[in-house]
């Protein structure tokens, strides 16, 4: 019988709750429109995650993707975790490798 290897980045329920509380007050840093998830959008998200660790994104009405689809597509391409999806908005978290910022303590 094979053991399932857990994802080292997987967040606990307590960590998700803490990140949701922090993300509540954020304004969307990334807007996803008609072009969906492009390389330029991924690069912008990478930069925002490195600078802030926790970002909020919004899917505009013209997009062909739902917020859940966009969240998972962007999280996969940026190696981030989806914290929460509500309506047209979602939050992503990834620990930053930068040492010059205040890291979120989980």
Regions found by a protein language model. Name each.
Residues 2-106:
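Positively charged, polar, low-complexity stretches
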């Amino acid at each position: 019988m094979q053991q399932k290897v857990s994802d080292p980045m997987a967040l606990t329920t307590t960590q998700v709750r803490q990140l949701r509380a922090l993300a509540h007050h954020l304004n969307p840093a990334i807007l996803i429109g008609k072009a969906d998830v492009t390389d330029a959008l991924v690069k912008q998200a990478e930069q925002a995650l490195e600078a802030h660790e926790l970002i909020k994104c919004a899917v505009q009405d013209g997009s062909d993707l739902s917020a859940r689809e966009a969240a998972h597509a962007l999280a996969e391409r940026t190696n981030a975790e989806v914290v929460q999806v509500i309506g047209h908005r979602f939050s992503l978290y990834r620990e930053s490798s930068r040492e010059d910022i205040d890291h979120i303590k989980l």
